[in-house]
UniProtKB/Swiss-Prot annotation:
<dbReference type="GO" id="GO:0005634">
    <property type="term" value="C:nucleus"/>
</dbReference>
<keyword id="KW-0217">Developmental protein</keyword>
<dbReference type="GO" id="GO:0003700">
    <property type="term" value="F:DNA-binding transcription factor activity"/>
</dbReference>
<dbReference type="InterPro" id="IPR009057">
    <property type="entry name" value="Homeodomain-like_sf"/>
</dbReference>
<dbReference type="GO" id="GO:0080147">
    <property type="term" value="P:root hair cell development"/>
</dbReference>
<comment type="function">
    <text>MYB-type transcription factor involved in epidermal cell fate specification. Acts as a negative regulator of trichome development, by mediating lateral inhibition. Promotes the formation of hair developing cells in H position in root epidermis, probably by inhibiting non-hair cell formation.</text>
</comment>
<keyword id="KW-0804">Transcription</keyword>
<keyword id="KW-0238">DNA-binding</keyword>
<protein>
    <recommendedName>
        <fullName>MYB-like transcription factor ETC1</fullName>
    </recommendedName>
</protein>
<dbReference type="GO" id="GO:1900033">
    <property type="term" value="P:negative regulation of trichome patterning"/>
</dbReference>
<dbReference type="InterPro" id="IPR015495">
    <property type="entry name" value="Myb_TF_plants"/>
</dbReference>
<dbReference type="InterPro" id="IPR017930">
    <property type="entry name" value="Myb_dom"/>
</dbReference>
<dbReference type="InterPro" id="IPR001005">
    <property type="entry name" value="SANT/Myb"/>
</dbReference>
<feature type="domain" description="Myb-like">
    <location>
        <begin position="35"/>
        <end position="72"/>
    </location>
</feature>
<keyword id="KW-0539">Nucleus</keyword>
<keyword id="KW-0805">Transcription regulation</keyword>
<dbReference type="GO" id="GO:0003677">
    <property type="term" value="F:DNA binding"/>
</dbReference>
Length: 83
């Protein structure tokens, strides 16, 4: 019975995300402002550990892994457009 109610709810409410792994388009992202020190640390950590955003976020107080990944993607997307 609970699964029937859940599937009905998913059909009537299109704003529910079916999977946490879905990507959000860049149009829905707000630009993340980072201090220069944060940017430097993100760049250095990325060179060391790659896309381990949780690990990088653990070194920057007040920042989530999602914010750092979004910042990285947007920053590198802008660089590729400038080339």
């Amino acid at each position: 019975m609970n699964t029937q109610r859940k599937s009905k709810h998913l059909k009537t409410n299109p704003t529910i995300v079916a999977s946490s792994s879905e990507e959000v388009s860049s149009l829905e992202w707000e630009e993340i402002a980072m201090a220069q020190e944060e940017e430097d640390l993100i760049c250095r950590m990325y060179k060391l550990v790659g896309e381990r955003w949780d690990l990088i976020a653990g070194r920057i107080p007040g920042r989530t892994a999602e914010e750092i990944e979004r910042f990285w993607v947007m920053k590198n997307h802008r660089r590729s457009q400038l080339r």
